[in-house]
Amino acid sequence: MAIYLDFENHIKEIQNEIELALIRGDEDAKEILEKRLEKEVKSIYSNLTDFQKLQLARHPDRPYAMDYIDLILKDKYEVFGDRHYNDDKAIVCFIGKIDNVPVVVIGEEKGRGTKNKLLRNFGMPNPCGYRKALKMAKFAEKFNLPILMLVDTAGAYPGIGAEERGQSEAIAKNLQEFASLKVPTISVIIGEGGSGGALAIAVADKLAMMEYSIFSVISPEGCAAILWDDPSKTEVAIKAMKITPRDLKEAGLIDDIILEPSKGAHRDKFSAANTIKEYFLDALRTIQQDPHFLDNRYQKLMSLGSFVEGMN
């Protein structure tokens, strides 16, 4: 059963009316209602607030990394373990083909259903997850395979055990190593891009965001609690933090925005998956045609956060 957010109530009502018209066999009413639905969807989704976009990024029906991997990766083979400690189920690693192009895919997976969410630790990786990702990145480099990374996490796991096993070191090591990989790297934020937990697999030649995803240094709720001691100021925090694709593209922090189906990726995961596939293939061709892509990646990374002071 489809889950509708509070701002989608009118869409839900029209959808229910369409289903009733189908039961009655009333094709004329169905056609009229479908036109109303299309108009309503366009009206709502063209005027979304940043808070509503955050709700979409966290939508329980939103496609996760495994959904996209199952749809776009063929002849896939999953690889486990970090060769140091354990296998972290919050990070998934695959070898496979996208349109006959051999690739390595690394993704952060939140899981569906209580048991799977617990198995995946709600998509919050431990150090062994980031080390598994690095192991696969080095494998890709050795065999000259491009890398697709799918980012979707509220953040790296903040537990005591994770800190004892070097959470910050694992993330920092990934930032360092991914910056110098000698193969094309493409990262897509598909839902939540939470702080260092996202950055650990977001250093790439091309960094894109799905239209209704977010990328932030802290959750808006956490920001509101720290700055105003009031979690109810989440919407104020969102505006101040500039976490939407549009804001980040304007700031030069991401390269591209991947458009979603009219009602979001959660309403049509097949179209969303195909869009990601086409983006990956187009970006890969662009990178492969550039003999200086490593230098360009370095220059892009070094330019982040730079500024020029005004002259008096």
From Swiss-Prot:
Subcellular location: Cytoplasm
Limits of the CoA carboxyltransferase C-terminal domain: 36-286
PROSITE patterns: COA_CT_CTER
Pathway as given in its UniProt record: Lipid metabolism; malonyl-CoA biosynthesis; malonyl-CoA from acetyl-CoA: step 1/1
Family that this chain belongs to: Belongs to the AccA family.
GO molecular function, one term: carboxyl- or carbamoyltransferase activity
Known partners and oligomeric status: Acetyl-CoA carboxylase is a heterohexamer composed of biotin carboxyl carrier protein (AccB), biotin carboxylase (AccC) and two subunits each of ACCase subunit alpha (AccA) and ACCase subunit beta (AccD).
Location, primary (coarse class): cytoplasm
Source organism per UniProt: Helicobacter pylori (strain P12)
A GO cellular-component term linked to this record: acetyl-CoA carboxylase complex
Function: Component of the acetyl coenzyme A carboxylase (ACC) complex. First, biotin carboxylase catalyzes the carboxylation of biotin on its carrier protein (BCCP) and then the CO(2) group is transferred by the carboxyltransferase to acetyl-CoA to form malonyl-CoA.
Catalytic function, reaction form: N(6)-carboxybiotinyl-L-lysyl-[protein] + acetyl-CoA = N(6)-biotinyl-L-lysyl-[protein] + malonyl-CoA
Sorted UniProt keywords: ATP-binding, Cytoplasm, Fatty acid biosynthesis, Fatty acid metabolism, Lipid biosynthesis, Lipid metabolism, Nucleotide-binding, Transferase
Superkingdom of origin: Bacteria
Name of this protein: Acetyl-coenzyme A carboxylase carboxyl transferase subunit alpha
Entry's EC annotation: 2.1.3.15
Positions of disulphide bridges: none
Lineage of source species: Bacteria, Pseudomonadati, Campylobacterota, Epsilonproteobacteria, Campylobacterales
Pfam families attached to this UniProt entry: ACCA
Ranges annotated as spanning the membrane: none
Cited InterPro entries: Acetyl_CoA_COase_a_su (IPR001095), ClpP/crotonase-like_dom_sf (IPR029045), COA_CT_C (IPR011763)
GO biological process, one term: malonyl-CoA biosynthetic process
